[in-house]
């Protein structure tokens, strides 16, 4: 007899050996492509080429998971396998909690991850829930099943470096070098992005295994033996005008202050360690990784205290570089906030990357549009690359990005591509991809999604919505409206998360994914979703008073009652 008594949450399994890879080809394991797609993308998130720690269900970003535990993962797989095209699966913090009758144009999956009532939205309370098996940290694309590995952030980082070069170095980073840290799931994009932007880079990472992975996947070019060796290499390559990325195993909280003491002068300074999560993402100065992980279990308060103190020293070094006239910016990991909490009162003297370099793109709905070939065949991606060039024929910068991506970026898991495009362009591309599936030019359907880091889908006062023109940085109605509109528009799955990127209490954000299966019904959904989704970004920035967004809204015919109604 099957027991009807629920198992205690704490009794579930977080570790399981073995490897998971998404199915390839056209053979369905679910009832339709509408359910096969989320199933494959869930599995793809846990592919060892994609996930940082797949045996623990961790995809990236400290403890960003794809499912709450292995029992939940198994039930999600079972539910998706049996789901009908007029049903919707509800997932609550990585746990499948219900299947409901809806309709064929409704999302097949609705996901809510890590959401806490604001007064309780702290790491301390979340970690209590997590330890009891009652919550899961979904990061952004981990719990929403649309992670594509480091490629997912390469172009955004590249665009940031290019714009910084335009603002500070007359449009060229040749002979310049970037100092940064963190080579995890997101930070691992930095060395390749710097290289593609024409700069050398020195990338500090405390785990040798992460450096090894970035070397193997060609995201970083070489590893230095120590700081002296790294600086010799940097001097040589910058003098030669070469864009070479160098990894250095060490602790940024020790190495950046040492470089300040030596009078070293990078040309740009940033950071992408997992500082948003001091318990799981930032190695304290003077500690070994083993000590750090052991004490995270036995004395978490001491770990958090030591990690934040080290972040304070790290940020003080970044401030010293800024004071010396070196362009310095936060790359969205909330390290400034952590430093301020331990007494670095001027931690926010250097800006975040969005207000400094990216916001004009967001005003036009331009952001990280990504797609994945469910066939598993790289040729499907190359054919879509060509289609993007055909349909957006006059954008040499975009064409250059696609050429560089094909040459330099290794696929992780299912073949995928990302490119930053905006309102009008996204729907055009999605409809074209759907026609390519219909005609048989592509071997299997394509899924289109994006990072939650996008123009209309996130409220994060220390990152995407920092220093908004009207002071609305912390207003989080916008990602909720984005999720609701994507649901009403017919996205295949929609997610609403809290705490991604910058940690508990500091962000709310939403995601969507839509399947191009070549049908007329898909085309109708694609036209709605891929117009409405970026349009919410234009709306949000127009509402805040940005002229670029207001002009874009008028050009695109958006009906914004308080702006142009």
UniProtKB/Swiss-Prot annotation:
BP-aspect Gene Ontology terms: L-histidine catabolic process to glutamate and formamide; L-histidine catabolic process to glutamate and formate
A family per Pfam: Urocanase
Any one GO molecular function term: urocanate hydratase activity
Composition bias, Basic and acidic residues: 463-472
Stretches for region Disordered: 453-472
Main location: cytoplasm
Cofactor comment text: Binds 1 NAD(+) per subunit.
Induction: By cold.
Pathway, per record: Amino-acid degradation; L-histidine degradation into L-glutamate; N-formimidoyl-L-glutamate from L-histidine: step 2/3
Keywords noted in UniProt: Cytoplasm, Histidine metabolism, Lyase, NAD, Stress response
Catalytic activity: 4-imidazolone-5-propanoate = trans-urocanate + H2O
GO cellular component annotations of the record: cytoplasm
Essential cofactor(s): NAD(+)
EC number: 4.2.1.49
UniProt subcellular location: Cytoplasm
Free-text function comment from the UniProt entry: Catalyzes the conversion of urocanate to 4-imidazolone-5-propionate.
PANTHER family per UniProt: UROCANATE HYDRATASE
Protein name per the record: Urocanate hydratase
Gene: hutU
């Amino acid at each position: 007899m099957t027991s009807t008594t629920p198992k205690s949450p704490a009794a579930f399994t977080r570790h399981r050996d073995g490897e998971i890879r998404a199915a390839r080809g056209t053979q369905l394991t679910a009832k339709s492509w509408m359910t096969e797609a989320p199933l494959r993308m869930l599995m793809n998130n846990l592919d060892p080429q994609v996930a940082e720690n797949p045996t623990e269900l961790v995809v990236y970003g400290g403890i960003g998971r794809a499912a709450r535990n292995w029992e939940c993962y198994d039930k999600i797989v079972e539910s998706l396998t049996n789901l009908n095209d007029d049903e919707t699966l509800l997932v609550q913090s990585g746990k499948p909690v219900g299947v409901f009758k809806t309709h064929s144009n409704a999302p097949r999956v609705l996901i809510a991850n890590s959401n806490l009532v604001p007064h309780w939205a702290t790491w301390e309370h979340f970690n209590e829930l997590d330890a009891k098996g009652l919550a899961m940290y979904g990061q952004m694309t981990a719990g929403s099943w649309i992670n594509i590995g480091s490629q997912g952030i390469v172009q955004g980082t590249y665009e940031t470096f290019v714009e910084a070069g335009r603002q500070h170095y007359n449009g060229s980073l040749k002979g310049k070098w970037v100092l940064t840290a963190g080579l995890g799931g997101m930070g691992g994009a930095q060395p390749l992005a710097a290289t593609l932007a024409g700069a050398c880079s020195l990338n500090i990472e405390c785990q040798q295994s992460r450096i090894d992975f970035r070397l193997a996947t060609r995201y970083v070019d070489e590893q230095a033996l120590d700081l002296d060796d790294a600086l010799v290499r940097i001097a040589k390559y910058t003098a030669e005008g070469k864009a070479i990325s160098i990894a250095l195993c060490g602790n940024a909280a020790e190495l950046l202050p040492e470089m300040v003491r030596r009078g070293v002068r990078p040309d740009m300074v940033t950071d992408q360690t997992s500082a948003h999560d001091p318990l799981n993402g930032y190695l304290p100065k003077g500690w070994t990784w083993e000590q750090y992980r052991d004490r995270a279990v036995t004395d978490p308060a001491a770990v958090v205290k030591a990690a934040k103190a080290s972040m304070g020293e790290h940020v003080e070094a970044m401030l010293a570089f800024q004071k010396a006239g070196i362009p310095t910016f936060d790359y969205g990991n909330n390290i400034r906030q952590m430093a301020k909490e331990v007494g670095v009162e001027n931690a926010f003297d250097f800006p975040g990357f969005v207000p400094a370099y990216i916001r004009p793109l967001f005003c036009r709905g331009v952001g990280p549009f990504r797609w994945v070939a469910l066939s598993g065949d790289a040729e499907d991606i190359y054919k879509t690359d060509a289609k993007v060039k055909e349909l957006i024929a006059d954008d040499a910068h975009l064409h250059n990005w696609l050429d560089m991506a094909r040459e330099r970026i290794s696929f992780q898991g299912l073949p995928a591509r990302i490119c930053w495009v905006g309102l009008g362009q996204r729907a055009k591309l999605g409809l074209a991809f759907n026609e390519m599936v219909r005609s048989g030019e592509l071997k299997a359907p394509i899924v289109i999604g994006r990072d939650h880091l996008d123009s209309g889908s996130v409220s994060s006062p220390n990152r995407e919505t920092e220093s908004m023109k009207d002071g609305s940085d912390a207003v989080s109605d916008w990602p909720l409206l984005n999720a609701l509109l994507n649901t009403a528009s017919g996205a295949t799955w929609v997610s609403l998360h809290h705490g991604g990127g910058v940690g508990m209490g500091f962000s709310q954000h939403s995601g969507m994914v839509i399947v191009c299966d070549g049908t007329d019904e898909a085309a109708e959904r694609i036209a709605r979703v891929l117009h409405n989704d970026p349009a919410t970004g234009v709306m949000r920035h127009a509402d805040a008073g940005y002229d670029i967004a207001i002009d874009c809204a008028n050009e695109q015919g958006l009906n914004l009652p308080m702006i142009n109604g």
